[in-house]
Amino acid sequence: MDEIDNIILHSLRQIECNLDEEVISLDDLSPSMLVQVVSKCISLIDPGLELPRTLPPGMAQRFTATASLAEACRTIGYRRDIGYQTFLYSNVAEVRRVLMFLVEKLPKEAADKTSGSGQPVDSATQLENRILSSLQSQLQAPWMPEFCQVGRPEGLSTTSGGESPAQIAFRRFIPRKISVPFVTQGDVAAEVKEFWSRRNLDCLDEGSLVPSLIAANDGAIKTNAKGAIDEVDRQVKLPAINEKLLQYYSKGGTKHRLAEPSGAAASSGTTEKVVLNNITVETKPGKTPLESLQEEIDALQQEIVQHSEEGVQLESSRKETDESIEEYRKTIVRLKEEKKIKERTHILLEDPEVNVKKLEAIIAAGGERMKKLQDQWDAHRIPLVDTLEAYRLKNSDKLSKSQQVLDQIESTRQKCEEVVIDLQTKGAMYARLQKEFEKLNKTVSRTAYTSRILEIIGNIRKQKNGIDQILQDTRSLQKEINNITGQLDRQFTVTDDLIFRNAKKDEHSKRAYKLLVTLHSDCEELIKLVQETGAIKREVRDLEDQIENEKGRNTAANLAQITHDLTEMQNESQRLEESIRRMEVTSRQ
């Protein structure tokens, strides 16, 4: 038990229960410490329960708090007897059962903490934990198409969040800030403008060039500086920019032209052309190339939305088609089964007389075969049944002998218990005499000691002889009972056989046979009553032993504590009544 207590206390300390170093066993747990420990464990098992963390000072509050703890223990599955007395007037065995139950019910995190806390984690374990967490996060993330993941900024969530497919596809439109401090000023030299334009445009990659230009032009329009980027486009004639734009439009995957040339506009000369080497963008009067690009982007967005809706409709129609195909398959299978049945029926109906005779012959052959199988089964079953009956008879004889042996063992056990009780009595007497001997004067003569020892030895020898005589008488009595029982059984068997033979011819013999059977049943009932009486006596002895064990507990100390608590409660009640009276008097005044 000390080892179990150490394990329980170690587990409680690992879950951060405030236990003093002086607490080395469960006997050292006071009611307040026990309440704190149980409350901590229950809060870890079920955090939703509201429980008192400490034991209140008042007796009424103590009873309420401990009763709530007992109810919480029953709520989480404790099936033994528990109440406020378990915490206020605790018994070590009950406390051990409660704490063992709570430690076993602790959640996995707390159990891991109790088993592995304080151990350093090596780098390999840390790496495995990081890999595990990364894989778990990737597995929990929803799947996204590949084209929706291109150009996604770092840290952007992979969930769609209810966005349309067009919005997901156009996430790659990521503009960057273009810093052109004084390119648009009139007094700046062309070489300086070219230098700053080249430097700023070379800082951009092919994916963010066009979005950056569009965003910068839009900002210039908002700040009443319309045409700032257009002037740069007109003045800067760089092969690098042309190559980047060509690569962008060739890799962008779009097959649409930026703007279709209009014949009427070309003939009338109402269109304006902005040329960057090999790239030509025709714009309508009053519109910039950025606006034309924006219109093209809007058109592409509408097409993407339209294609997405068409894809959803096609998917729904595909599902409906799959369902109809499955129904058709089931119908085909059912029709094939019906076709087989009808074909067989048609074959039978082609020549009914011959087919009926064939069926009758098959049925007759099956009946004969069944009869042969039944005969074979009976031929195998009857010997096995006889063998089984013989084994049952042998088993019943063995059971009767086993019962006799069990009765002998039980009687021997009772005698051993009596001897043990007698030995305990003698041990108590020996302890008492030992204490008396220690209290005696050391100057007692050797003769008194010798006579006392001889007297004790004589008494012990007499008691031993008496016990041996009782055991011998019991053994002889048991042997006589067994012999008489065997003789009675044999005599009853012989008498039953003789009277049964004459009972068929003589009426008196028949009556004597009935009386013999009644006598035998009465004797068996009497034996059963004697056995039940012995069992009741054994139960009485067990109950007496339990009473002695209960007397050995600290019942007196618990009663004294209960009396003390009752006195405190009465004093508290009196103080409360006095305070209520004072408050009433104050309110009346």
Swiss-Prot record:
<protein>
    <recommendedName>
        <fullName>Coiled-coil domain-containing protein 22 homolog</fullName>
    </recommendedName>
</protein>
<dbReference type="Pfam" id="PF21674">
    <property type="entry name" value="CCDC22_N"/>
</dbReference>
<feature type="coiled-coil region">
    <location>
        <begin position="287"/>
        <end position="426"/>
    </location>
</feature>
<feature type="compositionally biased region" description="Basic and acidic residues">
    <location>
        <begin position="574"/>
        <end position="589"/>
    </location>
</feature>
<dbReference type="InterPro" id="IPR008530">
    <property type="entry name" value="CCDC22"/>
</dbReference>
<feature type="coiled-coil region">
    <location>
        <begin position="523"/>
        <end position="589"/>
    </location>
</feature>
<dbReference type="InterPro" id="IPR048349">
    <property type="entry name" value="CCDC22_N"/>
</dbReference>
<comment type="similarity">
    <text>Belongs to the CCDC22 family.</text>
</comment>
<dbReference type="Pfam" id="PF05667">
    <property type="entry name" value="CCDC22_CC"/>
</dbReference>
<feature type="region of interest" description="Disordered">
    <location>
        <begin position="568"/>
        <end position="589"/>
    </location>
</feature>
<dbReference type="GO" id="GO:2000060">
    <property type="term" value="P:positive regulation of ubiquitin-dependent protein catabolic process"/>
</dbReference>
<dbReference type="InterPro" id="IPR048348">
    <property type="entry name" value="CCDC22_CC"/>
</dbReference>
<keyword id="KW-0175">Coiled coil</keyword>
<dbReference type="GO" id="GO:0097602">
    <property type="term" value="F:cullin family protein binding"/>
</dbReference>
